[in-house]
A protein has these predicted regions:
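Glycine/Thr-rich beta-alpha phosphate-binding loop at enzyme active sites
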Residues: 1-6, 87-118
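Catalytic cores of alpha/beta
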Residues: 34-45, 78-89, 134-150
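C-terminal helical cap(s) of enzyme catalytic domains, especially alpha/beta-barrels
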Residues: 109-110, 158-185
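Catalytic-face loop-and-helix region of soluble metabolic enzyme cores
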Residues: 97-107, 117-140, 145-156
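N-terminal active-site wall of soluble small-molecule enzyme domains
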Residues: 2-45, 55-64
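Hydrophobic faces of well-ordered beta-strands that scaffold small-molecule active sites
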Residues: 1, 23-31, 50-53, 68-74, ...
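Glycine-rich phosphate-binding active-site loops on the catalytic face of alpha/beta enzymes
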Residues: 1-2, 46-61, 94-105, 145-167
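Generic structural signal for hydrophobic
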Residues: 17, 42-45, 63, 86, ...
Length: 185
């Protein structure tokens, strides 16, 4: 509930920021505490276009609520049959592959990770996004996008700490996406 209380105290700022953006913006609800119906109503009262939650943490009242799109995060240990079933659900508009166990988060993105996101991307025609829980660089993107992944969610844990370092890390991916020779987009 603490995170949702912070959301409520920042409501005016959130509304102002979202009113200036032309891209869809969502909110990621973490695992601090189970989400209550009251907390959910606070979320949907804000102008977010989608909510992102792990499947094992998403209450059915969230899943069934048609007021907001659902991006469902797939964690390590989910069986492929579960992933396919979740992807087939009408209320789910996209999957986020958050497939890295906490022990492996400091390592570079590797071949096993690449093969796993390839499998997940092949299971569904819906968009699949990769949460960058391991070190991924802009140079890795052409190969990652060839798997069928439609984009990435930059996890701050892979970037250097500090505001300037974070900006530089994000800037590297933005510049990669804007390159005229980038045919992988």
């Amino acid at each position: 509930m603490e995170g949702l209380r912070r959301l409520e105290t920042q409501e005016q700022s959130i509304r102002e920021i979202l009113s200036t953006l032309s891209i869809p913006v969502g909110v990621s609800i973490g695992e601090a505490r189970p989400l209550s119906r009251e907390g959910w109503e606070s979320v949907v009262s804000l102008p977010f276009r989608f909510v992102n939650m792990y499947a094992h943490q998403m209450p059915l009242f969230v899943h069934q609520d048609g007021r907001i799109d659902k991006f469902v995060s797939i964690g390590p240990g989910y069986m492929l049959e579960q992933v396919k079933t979740i992807a087939e659900m009408e209320q789910v508009v996209a999957l986020e592959a958050a497939i890295v166990s906490s022990q492996a988060k400091l390592y570079p993105f590797g071949l096993l990770d690449l093969s796993t996101i390839t499998l997940i991307s092949r299971l569904t025609p819906k968009p699949v996004f990769l949460r960058t829980q391991k070190r991924v660089t802009p140079d890795d993107m052409p190969l990652i996008l060839k798997t069928g992944v439609r984009g990435i969610t930059l996890d701050p844990s892979i970037l250097e700490p500090g505001i300037e370092e974070y900006r530089d890390g994000v800037r590297g991916f933005v510049q990669w996406g804007a390159r005229p020779d980038n045919e992988s987009r």
